[in-house]
Amino acid sequence: MSVIELFQKLLKFKSITPNDDGAFDFIQEYLGNEWNCIKVDMEGVKNRFYYKKFNDTKQHLCFAGHIDVVPVGNGWEVDPFAAEVIDGVITARGAQDMKSGDAAFLYACKNAKNFDGTLSILMTSDEEGEGTYGTIKMLEHLKQINMIPNYAVVAEPTCEEVFGDAIKVGRRGSINGYITIKGKQGHAAYPEKCINPVHNFAHILPKIAGINLDNGDEYFAPSKLVITDIRAGMEVTNVTPNELKIMFNVRNSTNTTKEDVENFINQNLKGLDYDFRITQGSFPFVTNKTSKVVIAMENSIYDILKIKTKHSTAGGTSDARYFGAFGIEAIEFGVINDTIHSINEKTTVKEVEGLTEVFENLIKNF
C-alpha cells in the first residue's frame, strides 16, 4: 500500500469529533503485530498509543496527530469523504487537517527498518473538540507507566505559502478576560442623576485595547490584549446603561502570565466599580532552537525539499501544548494549511509524498 492509498483510506473514515468511525481498528491492523498498542478511552473519546522498541537506548521519538475532523458543511464540489485524486489534488475533509500528516507518519513508522531507541505514535479522536479526554489523558497515563517520550513531532499542517517553509517550535497560550463596569441606569436627559459606565470607561479603553503586554522575543511576537466584545444598554437613545461588559483575549507568550494580565487590568481599572474574571484556556510552550528534534527536522526538510525552513509560534493552539506541559521537546510540521476547516479542503499528492519522505529521513538520521 502506497502512502497515497493509505491517505485515501484514512480520508474515507467519517471521523467527525469524537467518532473515529473504525479508523483506529484499521490503523492497528495496518501497523501489524510488531507494534504494541495502549488504549485510553474515556467519555466517548478514543486515544491510541502505538510503539515499537528497536533497541534498549532510552531515546524515544513520538509522532502525534488526531484522526478526528470538523463537520463538513454545505457547498462542496466533490464528496468530502470520497478521497479521489484529481490532477494530483485530493479534496476531502481532513486533507490538510490532518490526515495527510497521519498518513505520512504512519507510513514512515511502519516502514522504518532501524531506529536508535523507541518509535511511537500517539493519536486521539478528540482534538477538534474540547480535547478534555484526548491527548492529555494518554500523556497522563504514559507518565504513570513511565513511557513519556523525549521528543515529539505533531504532524499538524504548519506551512504557509510553500511546502516546507515553516515548523512550529512552540505555541502561544490563550487568556480570556471578562470585565463588568457597574453604573446607575437613568434618563439620558438627566446625566447628573446617572452613573454612566460607558463614560467612566471610555478614557481607559485606549490604555488597554491592542496594547502589547511584553516586547516579544526570538520565538514569540508580543503578547497583545485584543478586545473581542463590548456591550451596554438596551439599544435605545434615552436611557443610560446600568453596566458595561467587556471581553478580551490575550494570546500570550512565555513572557506574560495570567497574573501579569490580571495585574495590568486591575491597575487600569483602579477607582471604578467593577467585576473582573480571568481564565487561562491554554498555556504557552517553546522548544529551544538547539533541541535535537528541531535541528533534525531542519536538516530533514533541507535534505528532501531543499528549503531552509523558518521557526514559527503563530496561530492558535494545538495538542502540541500538552507535550510541552509534560516536558517533552515538541515541534510541529505538516503540509500547507491554507484550506483547513474550509469547504473544499484540499492538499496535493506531491506534498503528502514529500512529508512522508521528510519523516522517513528524520527517523533514519535521528
Curated annotation (Swiss-Prot):
GO MF assignments: acetylornithine deacetylase activity; metal ion binding; succinyl-diaminopimelate desuccinylase activity
EC number, as in UniProt: 3.5.1.18
NCBIfam families xrefs: dapE_proteo (TIGR01246), PRK13009.1 (NF009557)
GO BP, one annotated term: diaminopimelate biosynthetic process
Protein keywords: Amino-acid biosynthesis, Cobalt, Diaminopimelate biosynthesis, Hydrolase, Lysine biosynthesis, Metal-binding, Zinc
Pathway membership, UniProt: Amino-acid biosynthesis; L-lysine biosynthesis via DAP pathway; LL-2,6-diaminopimelate from (S)-tetrahydrodipicolinate (succinylase route): step 3/3
The protein, known as: Succinyl-diaminopimelate desuccinylase
Sites where the protein binds Zn(2+) 1: H66, D97, E156
Subunit structure: Homodimer.
Family annotation (InterPro entries): ArgE/DapE_CS, Bact_exopeptidase_dim_dom, DapE_proteobac, Peptidase_M20, Peptidase_M20_dimer, Peptidase_M20A
Domain of life: Bacteria
Family according to the record: Belongs to the peptidase M20A family. DapE subfamily.
